Regions:
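Repeat-blade elements of multi-bladed beta-propeller folds
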Residues: 65-75, 107-130, 149-174, 197-223, ...
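N-terminal secretory signal peptides
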Residues: 1-16, 23-35, 40
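Conserved blade-register residue in beta-propeller folds
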Residues: 133, 176, 232, 312, ...
Length: 556
């Protein structure tokens, strides 16, 4: 069935900027907490009950818990395999078992998604929004669902309630496919604004599909009036149950110029069904004049909520709290990754934190009940201008992290350690904006950094010769990383020692997945050019070989 946007899209009023404490003053005073918090029950449309009651937990997430049943491995987004035979003693025996060619092409490669592994099947989506079900053991095609709609990525699919859920990128639709056959069950248009798109994999929980729009698509990004919005859809029918506006409809007084917000990666979900989303940046970044008069940009608006915020929502989409990680963002320093939920044992009193990260080059631990920041760790290269709120007239400054840099792909967590993939690519800004000629992915380097979840201190750090943009993926005492040089690398979780590597021959620009004795690597063939900032920028030098999904297995 199909759900029309006119029928289901509900209007939201301006985002409320009132700030108030979500716990009693006595409780916060006793704990010594003083977070920057905000909440309003009016920030989301009221939720309706799903048409057909579905179990809270999608059965597949429990049934395939030992595989890789969600985009980030589990609903806490920890990116750690739960029952894999791949460890430091077997990783050197990994060998290519099969390859599955991907024909789609884009400036970001043929794929940017994390594969889903569930039972006998691997599910992936290419950069034209097409979905493939592949036999886990042989790499043979089971079914294919074609949409041929461009996207910027990262995209991807989610599994639940007998269906595969995904989106059509530029077409701004969410769809549900029968997981066994690939036949479309429903499709819903999220936005009638052609300046917006969808560039993320959803998560599925509580009878809902959780997904977001972003302020752009493959044609252009950050055009005036483009906004990111979070959605909860009925997983059975596609009906929009609630939506949460991540930016004010009035866009800080200049809707013809400003844009921003939305999410690029799926939210984390706690045991109570609360949602944790990282929200992207405001725009534009360059000075703008209207009729000769400088205007206030979204990126220079001091309270440009909820951009660059960690936002926690109730299951029905109402706001619990937010943490503003990067107000007054003039460098596109998103807080755009999937938050990761982890437990800290504070002298026998454990509490949960959401680990947020993004292009600002920081990992931030935020307590999930109150929204109080516990610690912040800078990672990768930083210059003195990284937190600047203005650039002196006539000056040019080097900014690191750059507009494409910092934590560009998802982090992982296991056994008290946070694993952070890093892209180092400084750029030059002046008082007129970004100097696009300095954005060259050929000059990028990478790192993989291990942090102690207790306090954010560095346990170890290793350097990579190219940008590390394929996330971090943990299997027992091994952590995998992939870089733009096309090499898959496996490191010891203990000290960062390199254990194994494999040259795929193409740029790696998508996260891996691990299940049992299988490592699945999307060899995307990336030739990165950041069209959003600099169409003339130098692409990363990679092979002309096409993209492929590669299945590695431990050889006997």
């Amino acid at each position: 069935m199909s759900s029309s946007n006119d029928q289901h899209l509900r209007s939201l009023g301006p985002v409320t900027r009132r700030r108030f404490i979500v716990a009693s003053g006595a409780l916060l005073a006793a704990a010594g907490l003083a977070p920057r918090l905000g909440s309003s029950a009016q920030d989301a449309t009221p939720a309706a009950s799903p048409t057909a009651p579905l179990p809270t937990m999608p059965p597949e997430i429990t049934e395939y818990a030992n595989d890789w049943p969600t985009p980030q491995g589990n609903l806490k987004n920890q990116r750690a395999a739960s029952n894999s035979s791949i460890d430091s003693s077997s990783v050197t025996s990994l060998d290519v078992a099969w390859t599955f060619p991907i024909k789609a092409t884009s400036g970001y490669g043929g794929m940017t998604c994390t594969p889903i592994i569930a039972g006998d099947t691997v599910y992936v989506q290419d950069m034209l929004s097409n979905v493939f079900a592949i036999k886990r053991d042989t790499g043979e095609l089971v079914w294919e669902a074609d949409y041929n709609s461009s996207c910027e990525g990262p995209n991807g699919v989610a599994l639940g309630y007998g269906m595969i859920y995904g989106s059509t990128g530029d077409a701004r639709e969410v769809f549900a496919l029968d997981a066994a056959t690939g036949k479309e069950v429903w499709k819903t248009l999220l936005s009638g604004n052609t300046r917006e798109g969808i560039d993320m994999a959803p998560n599925v929980y509580g009878g809902m599909v959780l997904i977001s729009t972003v302020p752009g698509n493959s044609q252009a990004f950050y055009d005036g009036g483009a906004r990111g919005t979070l959605f909860g859809l009925d997983a059975a029918t596609g009906e929009i149950l609630w939506q949460f506006a991540t930016v004010d409809e009035n866009l800080w007084g200049n809707p013809s110029i400003n844009s921003g917000g939305g999410s690029w990666y799926p939210p984390a979900i706690d045991d109570d069904g609360n949602l944790y989303w990282d929200i992207a940046n405001p725009a534009p970044f360059q000075p703008v004049e209207v009729d000769g008069t400088p205007i206030t940009l979204g990126s220079t608006f001091d309270d440009a909520l909820y951009t660059d915020c960690l936002v926690s929502l109730e299951p029905d989409g109402t706001l619990r709290w937010y943490y503003a990680a990067n107000p007054h963002d003039i460098f596109d320093h998103d807080l755009q990754q999937s938050p990761v939920l982890a437990t800290i044992d504070n002298n026998g009193s454990p509490y949960t934190v959401a680990l947020s990260s993004g292009k600002l080059g920081k990992v931030i631990a935020v307590e999930t009940t109150t929204g109080h920041m516990i610690w912040t760790a800078k990672v990768g290269e930083h210059t003195q201008w990284d937190d600047a709120q203005w650039i002196p007239p006539g000056q040019s400054v080097t900014v690191a992290p750059g507009v494409a840099g910092g934590v560009e792909s998802p982090i992982a967590y296991a056994d008290g350690t946070v694993y952070v993939p890093i892209l180092n690519l400084p750029v030059t800004f002046n008082d007129k904006g970004l100097d696009a000629s300095t954005l060259s992915f050929n000059d990028a380097t990478g790192e993989l950094t291990a942090l102690d979840v207790m306090d954010g201190s560095v346990k170890w750090d290793v350097k990579l010769p190219a940008g590390n943009v394929s996330a971090a993926t943990v299997s027992n005492d091994v952590v995998f990383a992939g870089a733009l040089d096309g090499i898959v690398r496996a490191y010891s979780t203990n000290d960062g020692t390199l254990l194994w590597s494999y040259d795929t021959g193409v740029g790696l620009n998508a996260p891996f997945a691990v299940a049992g004795d299988l490592l699945v690597v999307p060899a995307a063939g990336a030739k990165l050019v950041s069209k959003s900032y600099a169409p003339e920028a130098t692409p990363v030098a990679t092979s002309d070989a096409g993209a492929a999904l590669i299945g590695f297995k431990v050889s006997s």
